[in-house]
A protein has these predicted regions:
Chain B
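The feature marks the mature, well-folded catalytic cores of soluble enzymes
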Residues: 2-226
Length: 481, 226, 245
């Protein structure tokens, strides 16, 4: 998948335009957000449940290396194979090699974010193995070659007419229709054939349980269950932070994930695999290969602050509540993970230099933090990344590749910080700036300004600087008060 | 050579993780239990039925196995089913579905009738109008079915056909997921797969429009026995 | 009489001094004695939010030097209060002596409505305003400080005022400091939605407790809906009080 995080501002502008043209787009996250509220209300103490989710994820990260070893040991004891990949390339190449060795003509995929992160589809195609996305939304955007608009509803923004044309051309649909149910039915028939004949299935996973060596997937469509039932070979890919200590923890995270994601008490299907099929079982994989992907995470893990971003369980509650995501949609974020989740993860995965706009395009409103079932403090992380741009000399900045700020900004804050601890300088600075600032003001309002602050004035006014600041007034009339 | 490369990636990753600064493990906050934990047997069955129906499932209640078979016959006739795929699990075994099929002239198949995976897949994907299974558990908390997949419970029976009919003895209804998982993972070997099924296969991926039967069953019918 | 030290945010000092004046009169009316340290400048938020921690630290130390001995510090801004309460201890975490001073100061810093209602136990300031009022839950007031009931109690106690509900009242207005200027496409769309919700609420007036939101929403209203008003809670209460007299 192409990375376009550096075009954030431009893409965000396009996103705003699209949402303006189609107000229904903004309703998607709002609808999911409302469902989430109702879903959480079914728990006796939602706040305690969320806090417990945060504690579980925090513990899982604290014990990460031990839990991974425990998981690996138990998964192998269950009969699974475990492959460790340092990078996206290592993971993709391994899966391609395995698919070739097994003689797979195509690969059926269950919906997963990690395989997008490692660019598996591209790698498979290059080697002449067709990847077929089993999830309806992923299937649509795969054929359209566009990024996911929303992590759990990747094609929710695509017009039915576009889908109709796509299915007529590419998915053997017989009669043109724009009815979502008939379109869904056409996709069912087409993908059913792929599920039926599949010899090689690839899925991601939501949780890996250290205690039992079990992997767990949540879904509503059944594409993942098919990918884990029909083929002879099942490859399940996980990033290394997916591991949880116990089955009990996994059940709690499952409750939270379903509710925070779609407001469901539990998603339609939850499948838990402990090894490949056993003798006498007629379906299920003959071999189960679990690929544990690092792709930069062990490096992120070195930094105790940045590490907190790895708590994420990909529920998308933060997207749905984010006022910025609601305006711009998923494309602007430029890679796999959109919304606040992406704003805290992608800078670490791709480097701060390629993602500076992402973590600066945030008002720090804290809505994401307030809904996160994993206890991620997104605003603090974004402030941290911003500081790494500025203090290029600290080791973390080197690790994540901070990108220098404009010299004018740096100079401004240098001057600012000199004045901020000297009030006389601060106040004389104000007196000096006032005539400049108020040059174009009219009746106490500034309506236009060129240069560095022009962005504000496109659609907004600003009050002129007061003839007397509060400070100056206080000096004069404090005796009256 | 190959082995060494694999091992080194593993060790490299783990060593890096182990070398990182340690952080404390937080204390877990107290959580009040779900209200289902306090329910009695009858209440559990009602709660299960209520929740399962809320997930657009359909519930029939039967007093005993004979009654369950009658109900099943009714469903099969109403749906106009010619052939069904059935599991051989311990819930279904006493119902003797093959004999029942002959009596009502419906072709009853089970995985044992097939030479292997491919033949079985052909039938379960394209040759049957419904899959019939027992369940190992049913969970009142969310109206959820729990199925342990093994040689008597093939995965595709509850997944590939457009209709899934599950026979649920009331004594298999438990309050919460924890009650299920504790027994499924009580001792090794663990089942190759364990699934929770809650309602039909569905999607909202096209403009948020709910579409049931995306890949799996469009409807799930439960016959609650006992 | 309870002495309380006022922190005047730089946005208020420079552009919205009437909010500071309103705060003075409100505090006095509520039976407190507001004092003002001449040496105050800025809490340091702009620097911290742009990543300039070293520079923000200077502001923090200056603030602590100035306000460190005060029994109570009150400011008409949730974000400035949040800066002092939450970010100062974090910023100064690597300097034990300063950290201790920051941590000791933190619980004594209040947002204005919080101070009036929770500390002075005053919710009726004796004001009158005939009309419908909507309240914007500013991010740093609501989620930053958990302050929401206090301003609503103060508004509801104003004679003749009806507090009406507003859709998405807890959604960010799109200010975010430099964000508003640097990402105008997004920020404008956000403030448009906020104003749309305000207009749809049928309120005559929008009240809030954060100068940043006031500049943003007010700036947009001034350009597009000059007949509609947005006010800081302090100004509203003080002005409504004057109308009464």
């Amino acid at each position: 998948m192409r990375v376009s995080t550096e075009q954030f501002t431009e893409l965000a502008g396009q996103g705003v335009e699209k949402a303006r043209a189609r107000p229904s787009l903004k309703m998607v996250p709002h609808f999911l957000y409302q469902k989430r509220e109702a879903g959480l209300a079914t728990l006796p103490d939602a706040a305690a449940a969320q806090a417990c989710g945060a504690a579980i994820r925090s513990e899982a990260l604290s014990r990460l290396p031990d839990l991974l070893e425990e998981f690996e040991k138990n998964a192998i004891a269950n009969g699974a194979k475990v492959f460790w990949a340092r990078t996206a390339e290592e993971a993709s190449e391994y899966i391609v090699k395995l698919a070739k060795e097994r003689g797979a003509k195509y690969v059926i995929k269950g919906k997963s974010m990690v395989t997008e992160e490692i660019g598996l589809n591209g790698c498979l195609s290059e080697h002449g193995i067709e990847p077929w996305e089993g999830d309806l939304g992923e299937f649509i955007i795969q054929m359209l070659r566009c990024p996911p608009f929303h992590i759990i509803a990747p094609a929710i923004n695509i017009a039915v007419e576009t889908i109709r044309d796509l299915f007529m051309a590419r998915a053997d649909m017989k009669e043109p229709t724009v009815d979502p149910v008939e379109l869904g039915w056409a996709a069912r028939l087409f993908l059913r054939e792929k599920f039926h004949r599949a010899e090689f299935g690839v899925t991601g996973l939501n949780m890996a349980v250290a205690e039992t060596g079990t992997i767990i997937n949540l879904e509503n469509e059944g594409n993942i269950r098919f990918a884990k039932s029909s083929p002879r070979t099942q490859v399940s890919v996980m990033t290394l932070e997916k591991v949880l200590p116990t089955m009990k923890d996994a059940l709690h995270v499952m409750r939270l994930l379903s509710r925070n994601c779609s407001g469901q008490k539990i998603s339609a299907y939850v499948s838990m695999d402990s090894g490949p099929k056993k003798d006498g079982e007629i379906d299920g994989p003959e071999e189960l290969v679990i690929v544990i992907v690092d792709n930069g995470r062990s490096r992120i893990y070195q930094d105790p602050r940045a590490r907190e971003a790895l708590r994420c369980i990909r529920c998308a509650a933060c997207l749905n509540i984010c006022p910025v995501y609601r305006q711009i949609g998923g494309y602007a974020y430029g890679w796999v993970y959109s919304g606040p989740m992406g704003q805290v993860l992608m800078p670490l995965l791709l480097g701060l230099d390629k993602t500076q706009e992402l973590y600066r395009a945030c008002t720090l409103c804290g809505a994401c933090k307030s809904v996160c079932p994993a206890g991620i403090d997104h605003p603090s992380l974004m402030l941290y990344y911003r500081s790494l741009d500025v203090s290029a000399d600290i080791p973390a900045a080197h690790r994540f590749g901070g990108k220098k700020r404009p010299w004018k900004e740096a100079l401004f804050f240098k001057a600012w910080s000199t004045a901020v601890e000297r009030f006389w300088m601060w106040n004389s600075g104000i007196s000096m700036v006032r005539p400049l600032m108020n040059r174009g003001s009219h009746r106490g309002v500034i309506r236009r300004m060129k240069g560095a602050f022009s962005g504000w004035f496109r659609k907004r006014d600003f009050p002129a600087m007061a003839k007397e600041t509060f400070h100056e007034r206080w000096e004069k009339i404090r005796n009256i008060w | 050579m190959k082995g060494r490369i694999l091992l080194s990636a593993r060790n490299e990753i783990l060593e890096r993780l182990k070398a990182a600064p340690k952080k404390e493990i937080p204390v877990r906050p107290f959580m009040p239990p779900l209200k289902e934990v306090a329910l009695g047997r009858d209440e559990l069955a009602d709660r299960f039925a209520e929740m399962f129906t809320a997930e657009t499932g359909i519930v029939y209640r039967a007093k005993n196995n004979d009654h369950a078979l009658e109900t099943l016959t009714g469903i099969v006739k109403r749906e106009g089913l010619k052939s069904v795929m059935v599991s051989t699990d311990e819930v279904l075994a006493p119902l003797n579905l093959p004999a029942w099929g002959i009596k009502i002239d419906v072709k009853v198949m089970s995985p044992g009738d097939f030479k292997g995976r491919d033949d079985f897949k052909d039938a379960v994907f394209d040759g049957v109008g419904a899959g019939i299974t027992g369940v190992d558990f049913a969970v009142a908390e969310s109206g959820t079915l729990g199925l342990i997949h093994d040689r008597d419970q093939a995965r595709l029976i509850s997944l590939a056909p457009i209709l899934h009919i599950a026979i649920v003895p009331v004594e298999r209804i438990v309050p919460v997921y924890e009650s299920v998982v504790a027994s499924v993972f009580e001792k090794e070997p663990f089942p190759s797969q364990f699934v929770f099924i809650t309602g039909p296969s569905m999607t909202g991926d096209i403009r948020g429009h709910l579409f049931k039967g995306m890949h799996g069953p469009r409807r799930v019918i439960v016959i609650l026995v006992g | 009489m309870k002495e309380v030290s006022m922190f005047i945010p730089c946005t208020v000092d420079l552009f919205l001094p009437h909010i500071g004046e309103a705060m003075v009169s409100l505090l006095q009316r509520a039976g407190a004695n507001p004092v003002y340290h001449r040496g105050q400048t800025c809490c340091g938020q702009p620097a911290l939010n742009s990543g300039y921690r070293k520079e923000a630290k200077k502001a923090a130390k200056h603030f602590i030097e100035l306000f460190g001995n005060d029994e109570a510090v009150v400011a008409p801004s949730g974000s400035c209060v949040g800066m002092v309460k939450h970010h100062y201890p974090e910023l100064l975490g690597d300097e034990p002596d300063w950290f201790r001073r920051a941590a000791e100061l933190a619980p004594r810093v209040y947002e204005l409505s919080q101070y009036l209602v929770d500390v002075l136990r005053v919710s009726d300031v004796g004001a009158i305003f005939q009309g419908k009022v909507a309240y914007h839950e500013s991010c740093h007031v609501l989620r930053g400080l958990g302050v929401s009931t206090q301003p609503k109690a103060l508004i509801s106690a104003v004679k003749g005022t009806k507090l009406v509900s507003m859709d998405q009242d807890d959604f960010c207005c799109g200010f975010g400091g430099e964000f508003a200027n640097h990402h105008p496409d997004i920020s404008e769309a956000m403030v448009q939605d906020k104003v749309r919700n305000y207009l749809d609420s049928g309120a005559d007036l929008l009240i809030l407790c954060e100068p940043g939101c006031l500049l943003n929403i007010g700036g947009y209203l001034s350009r597009h809906h000059p007949e509609k008003r947005v006010m800081h809670l302090a100004s509203f209460l003080a002005q409504a009080g004057r109308e009464e007299r």
